[in-house]
Amino acid sequence: SQIQGFLDIPVDNLAGNPIFVDYYAKKYGSECENMMVVSPDVGSVSRARAFAQKLHMNLAIVDKRRQKANSCEVMNVIGDVRDKDCILFDDMVDTGGSLCNAAKALIEVGGAKSVQACASHGVLSGPANERIANSCIKELTFLNTIPPLEGACSKIKYLDVSPIFADAIQRIYEENSMSCLLYTSDAADE
């Protein structure tokens, strides 16, 4: 959404998070009671909180300190994740270091029962695939906004965003409102 102001043409920021909400609601249904959404860092709290509210789950936070670009040291887990099935919710995964460290902290420091993760964009550069394969993350789900990684480990799954794009194209063509597909100030639909 930040790029919208820098272009000379109309740009619409389509919301992908409803795809994740639908996926987890269908996957777990009423079993969500023992689950918790986790923000992998303090900067992602508002996005993760909105996601947790949509799924009627509680929120925890992994407090970390970044030593340099593409590396971090996980410091603490804020919130009671003991014996909970956790969903780490992030915007993108590049090398996977932050995400895998957060998952490890949830298990080792917080006592979580299990960890899965989702992120809108799977960049997956460098050691990401190997890190994810060797991590305690049970499943990592992305939207297919970036072409899937060839040879991705079996933990990685992609959800299709084409229905949102198709709906947007149809709405533009028919000159209908786009508001239900766009980013709003409510981070739940980001």
Task: Identify the residue ranges that each predicted region occupies.
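Conserved small/polar residues in nucleotide/adenosyl-binding loops
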Residues: Y183-A188
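C-terminal functional extensions of proteins
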Residues: I156-S179
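Beta-strand->loop->alpha-helix junctions that form or flank phosphate-binding loops
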Residues: V62-D63, S162, L182
